[in-house]
């Protein structure tokens, strides 16, 4: 815990693409330490230990993602000195670079970090734009892993982790996007206020730590648009015939290319080897079957093209991070609960 006098100043950075759930969810959680738990259990609010405020390049209101109206408390020019700057995740096209789009935000982040602020992000692209991730480890939402790795080559991306600390004195912390901003908030409350207060906030808001990481939630396939008609035809064929016993040999024959040429073109077009692509397609289908039905795991293995159920289970565990039975328990129960509503 960081020893200090007075409330912790937490600036929450807003851009037009910001997601309201993370922006205002963080605001609620950072308003809570010291105040809400005593109110819930005794009817008397305690002393608020953190002071959150929304900051943007200017204090003018704007429409954010999904049409939510955001009215910043401060612009960069009149923002109180922050102890922490939080960067919520935001919606941009994963296939596009944001170079130059957030120059003002990048300069401000660099300045306040140099001035001592801790940076906490569930949208690590802005940290990359500020040049703060070079030779650092990072994490980000599974849908943006390639974006981060491709556009900021000095970064070591840890896609399986839901929380990563980095930088000098670990003054940069990143969460994996989605609802893992809750983990980020709890970590910061524990670090700057205290573990007891972080636990109280978790109890008030009934939060659960994302200890599984991102891997079970992530799609194994990144569907890329490609101008390679031969590879497109092979992808379409595999989508209909993923159960075939030798999918790579079959696609090579379909392409009419030499084996090595086919392998190079497939990897260039899809970002995966042909074998990895076939495995990913089969495992995505297996995930759907585990979520929505009660077919035995051995039968599912056979249905998606694996005669050896033990090999299927090992591969599933390695790629997904859970065994098939664990995945069914976690996501099948969610599917059933939603279906009954």
Task: Give, region by region, the residue ranges found by the protein language model.
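…primarily DNA-binding HTH/wHTH and HhH modules…
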Residues: 288, 296, 310-341
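Basic, amphipathic alpha-helical hairpins
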Residues: 190-193, 233-247, 266, 287-296, ...
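Basic/polar phosphate-binding segments, predominantly the helix-turn-helix DNA-binding elements
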Residues: 239-240, 245-281, 301-326
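N-terminal beta1-alpha1 cap of cysteine-dependent amidohydrolase-like domains
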Residues: 2-80
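Catalytic nucleophile loop
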Residues: 105-143
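Short, Lys/Arg-enriched, Trp-marked, Pro/Gly-tolerant hinge/linker segments that flank
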Residues: 162, 166-175, 192-236, 240, ...
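Flexible gly/pro-rich beta->alpha loop and the following alpha-helix that scaffold active-site loops
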Residues: 51-117
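A conserved active-site-flanking secondary-structure segment within enzyme catalytic domains
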Residues: 134-162, 200-201
């Amino acid at each position: 815990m960081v020893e200090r006098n007075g409330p912790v100043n937490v600036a929450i950075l807003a851009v037009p693409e910001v997601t309201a759930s993370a922006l205002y969810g963080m605001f609620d959680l950072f308003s809570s330490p010291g105040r809400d738990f005593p109110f819930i259990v005794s009817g008397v609010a305690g002393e608020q230990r953190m002071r959150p405020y929304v900051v943007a390049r200017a204090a003018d209101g704007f429409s954010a993602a999904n049409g939510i109206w955001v009215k910043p408390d401060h612009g960069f020019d009149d923002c109180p000195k922050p102890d922490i700057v939080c960067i919520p995740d935001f919606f941009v096209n994963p296939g596009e670079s944001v170079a130059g789009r957030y120059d003002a935000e990048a300069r401000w982040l660099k300045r306040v970090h140099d001035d001592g602020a801790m940076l906490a992000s569930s949208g690590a692209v802005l940290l990359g734009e500020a040049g703060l991730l070079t030779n650092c480890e990072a994490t980000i939402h599974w849908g943006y892993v390639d974006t981060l790795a491709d556009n900021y080559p000095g970064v070591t991306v840890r896609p399986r982790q839901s929380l990563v600390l980095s930088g000098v004195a670990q003054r940069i912390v990143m969460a994996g996007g989605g609802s893992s901003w809750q983990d980020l908030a709890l970590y910061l409350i524990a670090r700057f206020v205290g573990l007891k207060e972080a636990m109280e906030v978790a109890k008030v808001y009934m939060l659960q730590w994302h200890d599984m990481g991102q891997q079970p939630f992530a799609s194994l396939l990144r569907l890329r648009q490609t101008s390679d008609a031969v590879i497109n035809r092979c992808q379409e064929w595999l989508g209909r015939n993923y159960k075939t016993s030798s999918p790579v040999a079959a696609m090579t024959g379909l392409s009419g290319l030499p084996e090595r040429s086919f392998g190079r073109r497939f990897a260039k077009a899809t970002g995966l080897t042909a074998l990895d692509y076939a495995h990913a397609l089969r495992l995505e289908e297996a995930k759907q079957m585990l979520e929505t039905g009660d077919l035995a795991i051995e039968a599912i293995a056979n249905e998606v093209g694996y005669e050896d159920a033990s090999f299927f289970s090992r591969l599933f565990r390695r790629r997904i991070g859970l065994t098939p039975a664990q995945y069914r328990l976690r996501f099948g129960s969610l599917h059933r609960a939603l279906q009954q509503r």
